[in-house]
C-alpha cells in the first residue's frame, strides 16, 4: 500500500520514461489524483540525455567561469561552498562527482556514474544565470574516474583563476582535520 507521510504532498522531481510517452503520463495522472503535482520531461529520457549531451559536449555553453586554484590543503572546495552561501554562483564539481578530487580521492560512498555526474552538472548549470560568472574549483580533466565534459573542460582551461596560497604547516593542519577519516582508517590497517 502507498503511504503518505507529512502534510505537504508534492513531488518536485520530474517524471520520465524512455521517450516521454504513455507510461510516464499515466503515472503522472495517478500521482496528480492523489494530490501531488508532478511534471513530465518532454520527450522522455532520450530527449533529456540529448539536451545534456548537447550542452556539455557539443555546443559551447554560454557560461563564464572563475576558477579557484591552489595546492592540496588550501580549502578550495570549502571556499567555493562558502561563496555559494553568500549567493554567488558556484558549482562544486567534486560534490557532484562524489569524490574528494585531491590526492586523497574517493569518499566513503561510491562515486557517481558518468551519466549521473553529467545530469547533476546539467541541472546545476540550468539553475544558474549564464550572464553572471560561475565560481568553481580548478580540477584536472578527471575527478576520480569521471571525466569533466569536454565543453565545460574547454571553458575551464581558458578561465581566469584566483590562486589560494597557504603555508605548508597550515595546509597540513587543515588536511589532518578534513581527512581525519583517512588517518583513522590507516591506523586500523
Task: Please state what every model-predicted region is.
Residues 8, 12-41:
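Catalytic cysteine-centered active loop of the rhodanese-like fold, especially the PTP/DSP P-loop
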